Amino acid sequence: MPELPEVETVRRGLLPVLQGAVIESAEARRPDLRWPLPEGFAERLTGRRVEAVGRRAKYLLADLDGGEVLIVHLGMSGSIRIEGAQVKGRPAGFYHPRGEPGTHDHVVFHLAGGATVTFNDPRRFGAMLLVPYDQLDSHPLLSSLGPEPLGNTFHADYLAQACAGRRTNLKAALLDQKVVAGLGNIYVSEALHRAGLSPRRMASTLASASGAPNVRTERLVTAIRDVLREAIQAGGSSLKDHRQVNGELGYFQHNFKVYDREGEPCPTLRCKGHVQRIVQAGRSTFFCATCQR
């Protein structure tokens, strides 16, 4: 499933084409995604101008001039591509034509000026919803989300307070979207390795008895931020389905230190351990038991 860096990469690719554009028409070729498309979906989008393209956690948000917000979730295998766009400052071949419509092209937006934005989702776990702007923050998908890990409200003091007294392991705490929004299996494994913290460690050890942060908390916040920024810069991680809107792959997977590196020597300087794989809550976790404590 795309995590924060992959969704942010898509958002940045959409921004120069979609923001300010008018949707001349919309096609709903397959209305039964993870949830049925909203009633009158295509009609409600036709003629609308996209005022802003944002992101919250793993959700894309397109603010429309009619007072609604289009929420897009890529699901397990969803991707968005742009065709027919000319973007200032981009090489002419940046947005690649794809020819005939794909079997799994479920929603297509035709923009004024000739560009198209297509949502492709082979497994149909993705979703598109229309929500009134003034109800966005209270929507069930968004209302309980924790802070953005790259935002100003995510810091050591917050994380220590969020983890104080929690009777769960550190990995489970970081995957809890109520604690911090947008993290998933890949980037939690990578951040914990950078911070030198075991995924088995109790989350409560990030806080002192008074709930104050400690050196482990500071290291972890820094590691999370650094890993996410580097992954976004690399266009995300393409393991199976993720592609940027121009069809190109992300390449952060080439920079993984532990994720999907089972049996390989730990890359930490002077560490003689090897990367292990364990299963936590049904998900694979990769870490080095020698240097992650």
Swiss-Prot record:
This is Formamidopyrimidine-DNA glycosylase. Its cofactor is Zn(2+). PANTHER family: FORMAMIDOPYRIMIDINE-DNA GLYCOSYLASE (PTHR22993:SF9). It holds the Pfam family zf-FPG_IleRS. The active site is at residues 2-3, 58, 283. Binds 1 zinc ion per subunit. The gene is mutM. SMART domains: Fapy_DNA_glyco, H2TH. It comes from the Bacteria. A zinc finger (FPG-type) spans 257-293. Monomer.
